[in-house]
Amino acid sequence: LNTEYFIAKKVIFSKGDKGTISSPIIKMAIAAIAIGMVMMLIAIATGTGLRQKIREKLVVFHGHIQIFAYDNNASEVSTHPISINQEFYPYFKQVPEVTHIQAVATKGGIIRTENTYESILAKGVGKDYNWQLLQDFITEGRTPNVSGEEISNEILLSTYLANRLHLKIGDHCHAIFLKDEDSQTPNQRSFKIVGLYNSGFQEFDASYVFTDIRQIQKMNKWQQDEVGNFELFINDFDRIEDVGYKVYGAVGSFLDAQTIIQKFPFIFEWVGMFDFNIYLIIGIMIIVGGFNMITAILVLILEKTPMIGVLKSLGMTDHSIRKIFLYNATYIIGLGLLWGNALGFLLLWLQQRYSLIKLDAATYYVSEVPIAISSIAIILLNIGVLLLCLLMLLVPTYVITKISPTETMKIK
């Protein structure tokens, strides 16, 4: 029989303690732990969710890694073609982390209607393009058919552009593309809108349209085996920098390789701040909860001073008595964690299910607060909070060693 645990249970569940001074203070400590846990869960779930969503959207439009000609200078517009006949295409055997590779080309232009116009970036894609990644963003219609023998005039437009241009599915839109030689007449194309997408990433929705890569090749007077660049997808985003170095070393001296982290450093620097904010919130909440627990335990020790004196007079060591109060603290913290997890998961579920909190897509790149829950992270958080709070209580429970059995008996 664990004597310390037995006595701790008696102290915790004693009916006579309901109206004592320590009772409301213990309830406040439980509430502080619970509120802190809710805040930490929300910080982790929303911070992780926002980071993942932004990563996913960048990958959909650009892949994890891009390979292009040095002369392009990482431009959004494909100016210098590269041959599709590469050792790494269509299977990048030199770098096994690469799961898919696709050839694309981009060209800047303008879509004009009778009343208005919008600048666009036409992204030409071919048979190897992975439409599945973009499928979640399709709001109406379908993706362009680019696998036929004839050059397709179908186009996928964003709902943002469609609304601004007053266009809908089935409409034909006229686009103008400048040629490389300024003196020549611009290329004009008529596209049929077969689908609309909405990624929530304002920067891309405001310009990106998807069409047949052969349209870009024809306008640029490229050969059928010439493309603008290659987009690579890998199996682990966390290893993107290492894989990027491998790809760079494997493509040869005439081509360059760039990860999306290198392409959009300002976005990833901003996203990196989420981790700092999460750690800051966790640290503050643990400190607040810990100090509330210290107050509760000190009050409980003072209230149970006569009991401590009796236990000491019966021969129980200071170490054993401290264990009794640490058992009590574990129960209080555990109760706070239980309520905190329950309330936190409820709030996260409501946000995930009903999208109650909206965001400005132009600022945050998403239209609503995304939620991502990692079971391992939540388990480690609960264990970490419990252990750190108990560690903080080792010092205040030291006052038990200063309590004299003789003096407590006199008080009693």
Residue ranges and their predicted role:
Residues 86-224:
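A structural signal for hydrophobic secondary-structure junctions
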Residues 1-37, 412:
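N-terminal Sec/SRP start-transfer signal
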Residues 51-85:
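Membrane-interface junction motifs in transport/secretion proteins
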Residues 21-48, 272-307, 330-339, 387-393:
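Hydrophobic alpha-helical transmembrane segments of multi-pass inner-membrane transport and secretion
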Residues 323, 338-381, 394-402:
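Short helix-loop junctions at transmembrane helix boundaries
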Residues 398-412:
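Short cytosolic juxtamembrane segments of multi-pass membrane proteins
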Residues 298, 307-352:
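Transmembrane alpha-helical interface segments in multi-pass membrane proteins
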Residues 179-181, 185-278:
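Mechanotransmission and gating elements of multispan inner-membrane complexes involved in transport
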